[in-house]
Amino acid sequence: MEKKMLTEVFYLHEKGSLADARLCTYILDDSDSIAIEKRPMMLICPGGGYEHTSDREAEPLAMHFLSIGYHVAVLRYSVAPAVYPTALLEATASMKLIHEHAKEWYVDTDKIVVQGSSAGGHLAACLAMFWHTKWLAEMAGVTNDILKPAAMLLNYPVVTSGEYAHRGSFKQLLGGNETEELLELLSLEKQVTEHTPPAFIWHTYTDQSVPVQNSLLLIGAMKKYEIPVEFHMYPVGKHGLSTCSRLTAMRDGTGIQKECGSWLPLAKRWLIALRDE
């Protein structure tokens, strides 16, 4: 019997979800010819300033992670006019769905990595920061272990609501309800705890949209808890580079920064080490 990669689309119906909120899964086959019983899973959260989810940071990255032996799920989460916590609840629903299908899909549930770019990095990091909390488990209707990611992989992430904030992301995420309490909660460098998972993070020094200080603040907070971080800062590059190659070039020809593309093999090495622990 011929076996093929399994692709499915699961529509998500959390409180406040938009009609097109969905999880797109790419599941590698379980061939008898390959000595792998279970595979790790990558949950991808594309960027887009909480206004849209970027095609450039979705399937192209999924194909890369599939090529190194990860199952992949791309979360097309709800964006404005949907507001917090809708996207976060869709991320928790995605984790629940992955666990429910773990046996069928041959997923190693101890090796689920959450990945995000830009505002998607903020969503991915929200899950990584809050997975252990009572309030999130109650909102999601699951136990905390279902929500736990093994690690987070962040591309030029939105992190802080403070001095170096990407204001547009927080405006869209909160829909104008930018209370001091919510801004404090969602300034993720302030939410790091001993429960925060290890991270691989990269950013460019010249990012004019999401300043590199976003990553630096998060790394500094993680260092206080001695949580492992691999960080790469490239001297030149605009925001939103994704693969940094023609594969994800913008229609105007920008978005190619070959020297930044080394993040892909560096992340591969990091992910393989994580997988083999």
Task: Give, region by region, the residue ranges found by the protein language model.
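N-terminal cap/lid segment of alpha/beta-hydrolase-fold proteins
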Residues: 1-37, 257-260
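Short beta-strand element of the alpha/beta-hydrolase
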Residues: 38-47
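Catalytic nucleophile-loop/oxyanion-hole region of alpha/beta-hydrolase
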Residues: 53-55, 60, 73-109, 257-259
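Primarily recognizes the serine-hydrolase "nucleophile elbow" in alpha/beta-hydrolase
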Residues: 96-166, 179, 183
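Short beta-strand/loop motif that positions the catalytic acidic residue
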Residues: 195, 201-203, 207
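Acidic beta-to-alpha connecting loop that harbors the catalytic carboxylate
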Residues: 205-208, 236-238
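Conserved alpha/beta-hydrolase "acid-adjacent" motif
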Residues: 208-217, 242
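C-terminal catalytic histidine-bearing segment of alpha/beta-hydrolase fold enzymes
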Residues: 219-277
